[in-house]
A protein has these predicted regions:
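Noncatalytic, basic helical substrate-engagement surface that gates or grips nucleic-acid strands
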Residues: 2-132, 136-144
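Single conserved hydrophobic/aromatic residue that forms the stacking wall/gate
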Residues: 145-154
Length: 154
């Protein structure tokens, strides 16, 4: 029986954040911060090389979610996003688009919510799913869906 096609779903925010904190500050010749961008792109390319997916997509958060409306202090203890990380999140979105991968964001939902929906739909369509994230919230999806933590060596 032939292997089922694979879809790789990447939690863009989680992987960028992990790279930002794991890799020492790097800058381009023009002074643009690049450590998170470098880490994200390295992880993405390695995952694509290792798994040869038939499909792939990257999800990003785009602001407040329905959870903020339900609970005013949702993520209230988190510090504001550093400017050098904000710049790199935008750069990563550009890189993903240039690589020809779909960027998926849904107003009022976090990236991991979007990935969970895409994962369940993909399984229902007969695909094997690999979610690339450092967010342990996705562990509740484990079944035929595989979770790939980018800090593990590839």
């Amino acid at each position: 029986m032939p292997a089922r096609p694979v879809i790789v779903l990447v939690d863009g925010n989680a992987v960028v954040h992990r790279a930002y904190h794991a890799i020492p500050p790097l800058t381009s010749p023009t002074g643009e911060p690049t450590n998170a961008t470098f880490g994200f792109v390295s992880t993405l390319l390695k995952v694509l090389e290792d798994h040869h997916p038939a499909y792939a997509a990257v999800a990003f958060d785009i602001g407040r979610t329905f959870r903020h409306d339900l609970y005013a202090d949702y993520k209230g203890t988190r510090p504001p996003l550093p400017d050098d990380l904000r710049v790199q999140l935008e750069r990563v979105r550009e890189v993903v688009a240039r690589l020809g991968l779909p960027v998926v964001s849904v107003q009022n939902y976090e990236a991991d919510d979007v990935l969970a929906t895409l994962a369940r739909q993909s399984v229902a369509r007969g695909l094997d799913v690999i979610i690339v994230t450092g967010d342990t919230d996705t562990l509740q999806l484990l079944s035929l869906i595989h979770i790939s933590e980018p800090t593990r060596p590839y």
